[in-house]
């Protein structure tokens, strides 16, 4: 009975409230433009948004390296840009760093 009384109030609050439009929402990488991936939102974990690939010095996840990825990403970071690698900078910390090939 109590829920029946609360329902009209809830509808009134929902209809009078402001709504938000999330631009760039996605489910998979293929829905994002070139140079982006579909990553978990930092603010609302149940939403994924198109996010730029990691630039030099930005945080990354060592197991996230394929673009486009066929499934749903579990992290809020995208893989690094093609000329960068996700390298460990300290215990548990990874950043996009220049790829040092043919150094010698």
Swiss-Prot record:
UniProt-listed SUPFAM superfamilies: Colipase-like
Expression by tissue: Expressed by the venom gland.
Disulfide bonds: 26-38, 32-50, 37-78, 60-86, 80-96
Main location: secreted
GO BP, sorted A to Z: endothelial cell proliferation
InterPro entries per the UniProt record, alphabetical: Prokineticin, Prokineticin_domain
Source organism superkingdom: Eukaryota
Signal peptide residue numbers: 1-19
Protein name: AVIToxin-VAR1
Species of provenance: Varanus varius (Lace monitor lizard)
């Amino acid at each position: 009975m109590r829920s029946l009384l609360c329902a009209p109030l809830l509808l009134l609050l929902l209809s009078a409230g402001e709504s938000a439009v999330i631009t760039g929402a996605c489910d998979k990488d293929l829905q994002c433009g070139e140079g982006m991936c579909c990553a978990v939102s930092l603010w609302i974990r149940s939403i994924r948004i198109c996010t730029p690939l990691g630039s030099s010095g930005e945080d990354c996840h060592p197991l996230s390296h394929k673009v486009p990825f066929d499934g749903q990403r579990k992290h809020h970071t995208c893989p690094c840009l093609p000329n960068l690698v996700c390298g460990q900078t300290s215990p548990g910390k990874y950043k996009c760093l220049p790829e040092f090939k043919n150094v010698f």
